[in-house]
């Protein structure tokens, strides 16, 4: 049985890729911004025993993309046109990894968001994304 921190619920949407990597969880923070999270498992790790950069990129893209899509009423799907990820630390098996998102700007066709990936107080990565409303 996986230990999930209080306040987190299963992620409200999924996909074949997320089903392979998950389970993913989410909640809103005190500023009503989306937080997406998962518990790091061996399947998420590289040969060095830490969470793979591709997983961190996927987690950032999921968190930022969902935050952007659900920042509009009604929610609207958006397409990632740019994603930047800066690695600042590592996540290990058993770590609870959270992506704290922030919507920076919503335009008519383009939107911008940023995120910080944390394991507890430890910063693992920072990310920014640009999204297009098709």
UniProtKB/Swiss-Prot annotation:
Keyword line: Hydrolase
Signal peptide start and end residues: none
InterPro entries linked to this entry: ACOT13, HotDog_dom_sf, Thioestr_dom
Top EC class for this record: hydrolase
Gene3D superfamilies from the UniProt entry: Hotdog Thioesterase
Source organism, top-level taxon: Bacteria
EC numbers on record: 3.1.2.-
Alphabetized GO MF terms: fatty acyl-CoA hydrolase activity
Family statement: Belongs to the thioesterase PaaI family.
Record's protein name: Putative esterase PA0474
Organism (species): Pseudomonas aeruginosa (strain ATCC 15692 / DSM 22644 / CIP 104116 / JCM 14847 / LMG 12228 / 1C / PRS 101 / PAO1)
């Amino acid at each position: 049985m996986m230990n999930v921190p209080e306040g987190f619920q299963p992620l409200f949407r999924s996909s074949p890729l997320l089903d392979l990597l998950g389970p993913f969880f989410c909640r809103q923070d005190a500023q009503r911004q989306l937080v997406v999270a998962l518990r790091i498992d061996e399947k998420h790790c590289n040969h060095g025993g830490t969470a793979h950069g591709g997983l961190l990129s996927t987690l950032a893209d999921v968190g930022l993309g969902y935050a952007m899509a659900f920042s509009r009423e009604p929610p609207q799907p958006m397409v990632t046109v740019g994603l930047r990820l800066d690695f600042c630390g590592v996540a290990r098996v058993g770590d609870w990894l959270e992506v704290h998102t922030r919507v920076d700007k919503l335009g008519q066709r383009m939107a911008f968001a940023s995120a910080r990936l944390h394991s507890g107080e430890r910063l693992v990565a920072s990310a920014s994304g640009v999204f297009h409303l098709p």
